[in-house]
């Protein structure tokens, strides 16, 4: 089971001093990825040291309608167009390509991405596919957004 990357979370200790409360590697707990952190509300409630990335999660939805999600997704070249294929969301997603190469598909074209590339996905129809011989990995922050076009399919 893949567990990369390392996750560091800070918080407060019993004396009210800042401290590292989590230093671990999360197991893959999503189809093709793992949660780093999830907040059910916005603004986030930082009053607890509870591990908001540990699950189990109440549903398979990768984002909370009123909060935010931070996840890592893994793409294998042999998987083809990932997940639900072309899909839309009711989120705005901030994406960093961490390793490998990916194709980012829209209804009218394809852009090839490499490590360090940044994507702002505004929820319109899109899809992902790893290219080359090596797996790819992205870090994604998902925030709720008003739908654009036809709205969410996932």
Protein language model regions, located:
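Short acidic-glycine-tyrosine-enriched beta hairpin
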Residues: 107-124
């Amino acid at each position: 089971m893949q567990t990369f990357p390392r996750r560091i979370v800070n918080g407060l200790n019993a004396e009210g001093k800042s401290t590292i409360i989590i230093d671990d590697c999360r197991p893959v707990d999503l189809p093709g990825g793992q949660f780093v952190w999830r907040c059910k509300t916005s603004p986030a409630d930082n009053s607890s040291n509870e591990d908001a990335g540990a699950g189990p999660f109440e549903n398979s939805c990768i984002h909370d309608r009123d909060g935010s999600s931070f996840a890592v997704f893994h793409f294998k070249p042999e998987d083809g167009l990932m997940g639900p294929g072309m899909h839309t969301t009711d989120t705005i997603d901030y994406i960093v390509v961490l390793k490998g190469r990916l194709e980012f598909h829209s209804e009218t074209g394809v852009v090839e991405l490499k490590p360090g590339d940044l994507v702002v996905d505004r929820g319109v129809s899109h899809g992902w596919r790893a290219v080359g011989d090596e797996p790819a990995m992205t870090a994604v922050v998902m925030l709720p957004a008003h739908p654009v076009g036809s709205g969410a399919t996932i």
